[in-house]
Amino acid sequence: MKMMTAIVFTLSLTVSAVALAAAPQLSVKKTITIAAAADKVWEASKNFNGLNTWHPALASDELVSGTNNTVGAVRLLTLKGGGTVKEKLLGFDEAGHRYRYAIIESVLPVSHYRSVFVVTSLGKDKTLVTWSGRFKRKNLGDSPADGENDKAAVDAITGVYTSGLDNLKKIVEAPGA
């Protein structure tokens, strides 16, 4: 009986590993040019515990552990439409105007998600913001349903990045900002 249990357990691990390996690595990269100095754009967007100040899809952003902008910090994002996303800060470079983070729990149709957010000066009043991520779909099965497939995962992250970057641009470029 112990032998049979060990075989079943080993097979289940093997099947899980094969499914994980079979699901393709997906990626999204979005950029936007903002008519403002890089320091101004970075100041508006750098706070790990402040995404809700410029991303229109968020109702709130709560730091649940750690210290803001310190590796290991964990934030809980509450979406306006319902649901939450928990993310962990993996890297923060103040001088380089960049941070890296991972999703650790989410209502989004993605898994194994890692992202980089970078603010790059293109001159006195011109800045490029790049938001990129690599991930897999949440449903790693062979035949995921519509809404759980690769397209749904890519579309969800594309929407997150596009709406966030568009609103960041609007806020930073607003008169008096």
Residue ranges with predicted function:
Residues 6-16:
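Bacterial N-terminal signal peptides
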Residues 19-65:
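Hydrophobic ligand-binding cavity/cleft-lining segments
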Residues 25-33, 74, 84, 98, ...:
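Intrinsic-disorder/low-complexity, polar/charged segments enriched in Ser/Thr/Lys/Arg/Asp/Glu/Gln
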Residues 30-32, 85-91, 105, 113-121, ...:
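Hydrophobic/aromatic beta-strand elements that line small-molecule binding cavities or substrate pockets
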Residues 35-39, 90-97, 118-128, 170, ...:
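A short, structured loop/turn motif at beta-sheet edges
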Residues 37-38, 44-47, 85, 153, ...:
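Stable alpha-helical elements in mature extracytoplasmic
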Residues 53, 62-109, 163-177:
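Glycine-rich portal/gate segments that line the openings of hydrophobic small-molecule binding cavities
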Residues 128, 135-177:
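A conserved amphipathic terminal alpha-helix motif
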